[in-house]
């Protein structure tokens, strides 16, 4: 098969196979072709991964941060040197077009490794003077971490979790989504080639049962999940049993607010990026596009024109701009949401159909006249389906934007920067953009509020979530006791 890896798992520095585990077929969503067949981790594989990680972590934590940094920097350089072949694998694994994977997936992963390599030697404690006594603090690694990935950005997510964990002295056992399991294996190989000691980044494959076994193991100190809200609830509850640290990057139903003084072409471009990039399969997408009434019809007319021009087709064609959804199951889910939007009274502006057979393709779709109570405005679709809602006043837009249980992201388009900052200050979202959308540089924290998650990925903020603080009180004089 065209993308068959050496083995299903990567444990203690080498590929590991156990064919007694349940099979995991890997399907290229553009054609339905099976491109690899892996096997789910058995209890023996899970134990080997956890044991080797726990065993290797102490020596890694004792290493000088600058030495850890050199290894991660080498891994970043290797990824960049092999970006083309890695991007091809990402396209086969996910169905995303090469036009995207060449610039957005492994490239971001390399950025994360490089950023945290640079940050690691600068992580220090503080001194608190107390007269002649004083306290100093030490930032220590948590220990053995578990990372659980999603299927939309599998390799980027693996890097976003591995980079801070490893840079700060932890070990990680990573379980990718069973839908897109290939990229994490490549990352494990590259880290070993770069000089990472065996056991510090292990990859095990599997479905929810494997994740549950990892999360509930007593040796695990931290769980970082990217996934849906229902999955997040289960993982959070399981982690709570052991009072483990958690980072949860979950779903969203994010608002993108377009005021009537906005640059129309830029706002439309952002709305398209926030709904159609990666075939709409991005957690931070601005799927509720609030457009001020005075410009709504002009916005819709130009949006339809640009959406109809999107080139769909074979993701391996470098000219193709939009590929298929990740699976047949996801295709059926998205088409059901489209039919529900029709039935509930949404006005179809463009798209609305499956496209480019065979494969899991859906046309870029826009519904107008959507109301806050419609399913399309309330639930995460995870497909190329945009809901356009109109509003009259700033206060109305803010109130309706916040009327959701989600809080991952939000965007504002306006020429009035005073208004932009005023609006953003009131939006209940962890990540916001002004006159931009879905740009997520690794230098900046990323994460949500409300049901969209806890904790932050990336930026200096990630240090807080992969370390713990030890306080040391130093007494400089005699100890007085009252007895």
Curated annotation (Swiss-Prot):
Domain of life: Bacteria
Sequence positions bearing Cysteine sulfenic acid (-SOH): 283
SS bond partners: none
Chemical reaction(s) catalysed: betaine aldehyde + NAD(+) + H2O = glycine betaine + NADH + 2 H(+)
Residues engaged in binding NAD(+): 149-151, 175-178, 228-231, 251, 283, 380
Single GO biological process annotation from the record: glycine betaine biosynthetic process from choline
Pathway as given in its UniProt record: Amine and polyamine biosynthesis; betaine biosynthesis via choline pathway; betaine from betaine aldehyde: step 1/1
Cofactor note: Binds 2 potassium ions per subunit.
UniProt binding sites for K(+) 2: 243, 450, 453
Molecular function in Gene Ontology: betaine-aldehyde dehydrogenase (NAD+) activity; metal ion binding
Function: Involved in the biosynthesis of the osmoprotectant glycine betaine. Catalyzes the irreversible oxidation of betaine aldehyde to the corresponding acid.
Family according to the record: Belongs to the aldehyde dehydrogenase family.
PANTHER family in alphabetical order: ALDEHYDE DEHYDROGENASE-RELATED
Name of the protein this chain belongs to: Betaine aldehyde dehydrogenase
Taxonomy of the source species: Bacteria, Pseudomonadati, Pseudomonadota, Alphaproteobacteria, Rhodobacterales
């Amino acid at each position: 098969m065209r993308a068959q890896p050496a083995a299903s798992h990567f444990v203690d520095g080498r590929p590991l196979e156990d064919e007694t585990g349940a099979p995991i077929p890997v399907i290229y969503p553009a054609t339905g072709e099976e491109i690899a067949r892996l096997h789910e981790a058995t209890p023996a594989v899970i134990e080997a991964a956890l044991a080797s990680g726990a065993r290797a972590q102490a020596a890694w934590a004792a290493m000088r941060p600058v030495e850890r940094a050199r290894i991660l920097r080498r891994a970043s350089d290797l990824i960049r040197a092999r970006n083309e072949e890695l991007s091809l694998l990402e396209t086969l694994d996910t169905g995303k077009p090469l036009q995207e994977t060449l610039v957005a997936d492994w490239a971001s992963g390399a950025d994360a490794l490089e950023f945290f390599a640079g940050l690691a030697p600068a992580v220090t404690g503080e001194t608190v003077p107390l007269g002649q006594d004083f306290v100093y603090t030490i930032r220590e690694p948590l220990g053995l971490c578990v990372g659980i990935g999603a299927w939309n950005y599998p390799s980027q997510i693996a890097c976003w979790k591995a980079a801070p964990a490893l840079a700060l002295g932890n070990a990680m056992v990573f379980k990718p989504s069973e839908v897109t399991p290939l990229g994490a294996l490549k990352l494990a190989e590259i880290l070993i080639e770069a000089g990472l000691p065996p056991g510090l980044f292990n990859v095990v494959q599997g479905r929810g049962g494997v994740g549950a076994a990892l999360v509930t193991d007593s040796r695990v100190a931290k769980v970082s999940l990217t996934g849906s809200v229902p999955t997040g609830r289960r993982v959070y509850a399981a982690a709570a049993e052991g009072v483990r640290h958690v980072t949860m990057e979950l779903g969203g139903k994010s608002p993108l607010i377009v005021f009537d003084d906005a640059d129309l072409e830029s706002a439309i471009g952002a709305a398209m990026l926030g709904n159609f990039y990666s075939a709409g399969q991005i957690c931070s997408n601005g799927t509720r596009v609030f457009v001020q009434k005075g410009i709504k019809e002009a916005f819709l007319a130009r949006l339809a024109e640009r959406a109809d021009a999107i080139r769909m087709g074979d993701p391996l064609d470098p000219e193709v701009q939009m590929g298929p959804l990740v699976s047949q199951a996801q295709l059926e889910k998205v088409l059901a949401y489209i039919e529900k939007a029709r039935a509930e009274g949404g006005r179809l502006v463009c798209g609305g159909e499956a496209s480019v057979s065979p494969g899991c393709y859906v046309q870029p779709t826009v519904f107008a006249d959507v109301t806050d109570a419609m399913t399309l405005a309330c639930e995460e679709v995870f497909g190329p389906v945009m809901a356009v809602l109109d509003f009259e006043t700033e206060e109305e837009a803010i109130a309706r934007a916040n009327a959701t249980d989600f809080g991952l992201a939000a965007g504002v388009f306006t020429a009035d920067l005073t208004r932009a900052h005023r609006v953003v200050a009131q939006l209940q979202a962890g990540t916001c953009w002004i006159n931009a959308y879905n740009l997520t540089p690794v230098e900046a924290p990323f994460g949500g509020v409300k049901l969209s998650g806890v904790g932050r990925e990336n930026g200096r903020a990630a240090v807080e979530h992969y370390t713990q603080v030890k306080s040391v009180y130093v007494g400089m004089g005699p100890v007085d006791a009252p007895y």
